[in-house]
Amino acid sequence: MQKNLIWFRNDLRVYDNTALHQACQNDTDKVISLFISTPKQWHNQSVSKKKISFMYYHLISLQKELLKLNIILYYHESTDFLNSIEYLIFFCKKHKVNNLFYNYEYAINERYRDYLVKKKLSQKGFLVKGFHDNLLFSNRQIRNQKNETYKVFTFFKKKVIQNLHNNIPQCFPVPSKRKSDRDIFLTSISLKNVNLNFNKNFFPVGEKEAINRLKNFCIYKFNDYFLKRDYPFLDATSMLSPYLSAGIISSRYCLKVLLKTKNSLPLNVLLTSPWFDQILWREFYYHLLIGFPKISRSESLVTWEKEIHWINNIKHFNAWKEGNTGFPIIDAGMRQLNELGWMHNRLRMITSSFLVKNLLINWREGEEHFISNLIDGDLALNNGGWQWSASVGCDSVPYIRIFNPLHQSKTFDESGNFIKKFIPELKNVPNHHIHQPHEWSKQKNFKIDYPNPIINYSESRKTSLSLFKQARLKLHKNGLKNS
């Protein structure tokens, strides 16, 4: 009989968990599991308090689900990754573990941690088994003709869909209940430093809750997703991002439920649908993270970005963070982030574009602020989104494209329903004036307790275009490539 240890990290689920499935293949093996928290490491990586809280409550939920399978989930608090490695080695010795099972993580610090774990445990005679679990296909399975990581989403998407037509990744079922063990018990998970600071009504706890949310979206919202997804006042998106980010649900299972609930539609229609596009963008950004490790250090993927002279006005940055820029759609989005730890995707694009191309603040400042506040914070997606907005990443928006807050506001929140929800100071402003409340305030001589715009949009746009153009030209004159 062998003793197998499952090392849970960013995969807090029992359904379709590759490491869990593989560890439970032999009915005679004893299976235990472990989660090691690393508060200092998370702090250094700017993981948000809301995400940590969300994760801890799901860890408790996972522990109860594992107990139903007669699998103990042990818990230990270390400080950082290096400290966690030493504890893992100690744990394996203490519990006489034979085999360690875990699912890969792809950021550079996590990859180095796993390299050290495998090296040190293997030297001590333990068998270490890692699995690709977070993505539909591994980076080695999706390569361009030069056997390199794709840099253009369209070509990446085409390759993935081609692979899916040939092979739909299968989901692993929940393992069968292990033989009863008198040592089975519920270990204590410390919540001494964790507050319930996320909205449980907005993001209910539990793998089953995530599964139900996915199924309800596919049944009731999928058909209208393309038409309604850009309107932040509508309940039109899946709201699955926190669950995907913490590994409470898998992208494979998202695809499985989509294909099952919409089985009357042709496969290619589903694989090219706008919602599945979002799953593929997630895959794309992860493949970039794997293929270009410097992304983990917030380095851009174009060389000319270093020539941009950022203004980095601290007062403007604080106004942006607090939702006090005087641009209603920007401020409503930022206040949604501050309140919920989540922001509608359209608003993420608008607010990030505004920070980088109108306020001319280094995109890394925005990246840091988002990741330290988002409940669905994810290095690959957050970095990819910010580099996209700043026009310095792979397949990014052209630098000449700058989101106009007024146009975006009128288009996607015409009646101001979303704006008034998060900016109560504007509750008395008529709907058709909500996008430029100060003009109405002057006309009616009605004072509103809301800041004036901190910049002139038109002037800031001209300045931005000039600076970005100069940066590209300067690099070109020096004989260097633009990307």
Curated annotation (Swiss-Prot):
GO MF annotation list: deoxyribodipyrimidine photo-lyase activity; DNA binding; FAD binding
Binding site for (6R)-5,10-methylene-5,6,7,8-tetrahydrofolate: 109-110
Amino acids binding FAD: 225, 237-241, 376-378
Reactions catalysed according to its record: cyclobutadipyrimidine (in DNA) = 2 pyrimidine residues (in DNA)
InterPro entries per the UniProt record, alphabetical: Crypto/Photolyase_FAD-like_sf, Crypto/Photolyase_N_sf, Cryptochr/Photolyase_FAD-bd, Cryptochrome/DNA_photolyase_1, DNA_photolyase_1_CS_C, DNA_photolyase_N, Rossmann-like_a/b/a_fold
Record domain Photolyase/cryptochrome alpha/beta: where: 2-136
Catalytic EC class: lyase
Cofactor binding: number and manner: Binds 1 FAD per subunit. Binds 1 5,10-methenyltetrahydrofolate (MTHF) non-covalently per subunit.
Gene3D superfamilies: 1.25.40.80, DNA Cyclobutane Dipyrimidine Photolyase, subunit A, domain 3 (1.10.579.10), HUPs (3.40.50.620)
Function as written in the Swiss-Prot or TrEMBL entry: Involved in repair of UV radiation-induced DNA damage. Catalyzes the light-dependent monomerization (300-600 nm) of cyclobutyl pyrimidine dimers (in cis-syn configuration), which are formed between adjacent bases on the same DNA strand upon exposure to ultraviolet radiation.
Assembly information from the UniProt record: Monomer.
Entry-linked PANTHER family: CRYPTOCHROME, CRYPTOCHROME CIRCADIAN CLOCK 5 ISOFORM X1
Protein name: Deoxyribodipyrimidine photo-lyase
Organism: Buchnera aphidicola subsp. Acyrthosiphon pisum (strain APS) (Acyrthosiphon pisum symbiotic bacterium)
Lineage, broadest ranks: Bacteria, Pseudomonadati, Pseudomonadota, Gammaproteobacteria, Enterobacterales
